[in-house]
Amino acid sequence: MLNISKSLPRPVRRVLIVDDNPAIHEDYRRVLCADDSHLDNLASTKSLLLGGQPSGKSPDLSIELVSAFQGEEALDLVRRSVADNNPFQLAFVDVRMPPGIDGIETISRMWDIDPDIQVVICTAFSDYSWEETSESLQNSDKLLILKKPFDITVVRQMACSLLAKFELT
């Protein structure tokens, strides 16, 4: 039996980055949309030094990244994506984004527009505990917290897992 799904290209998944710092957007772009050839070279070198076989390539995330630098801008993008029937599957949202609304308010209003979007809230600070965040947002099954500075592997793993989870819903 021919498995056609294996030969079809993976659909592009839409990920929204919401952060007031342009450098953070570039970091996400490097992590989530990277050419993995340098990672393959590192894996090969590691296997030569430490023994064993190099691990396979990172999964093809097939991601379209869209940037918003303030909460209100993010909400406009989410509204348009829903209206165009091309919603975001995942958003990485910073907590502090002066001078506008913060990440908690952004996420709350984002879920009013699109309750299916998966969210990773990102912060370098301890403004809110998990309990406060969960209580405030009331949708913790679609929420993960990522502490800055973030680890490349953790960001990719979160993206892979949450995008797969979105496809199951």
Give, region by region, the residue ranges found by the protein language model.
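Hydrophobic/aromatic residues positioned on beta-strands within the core alpha/beta folds
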Residues: 93, 120-124
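Short amphipathic alpha-helix used as the core "switch/output" element in two-component signaling
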Residues: 34, 69-82, 102-117, 134-137
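Alpha4 helix (beta4-alpha4-beta5 surface) of REC/receiver domains from two-component response regulators
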Residues: 86, 101-113, 124-147, 153, ...
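Non-catalytic signal-transmission and effector/linker regions of two-component phosphorelay proteins
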Residues: 1-64, 72, 79-84, 89, ...
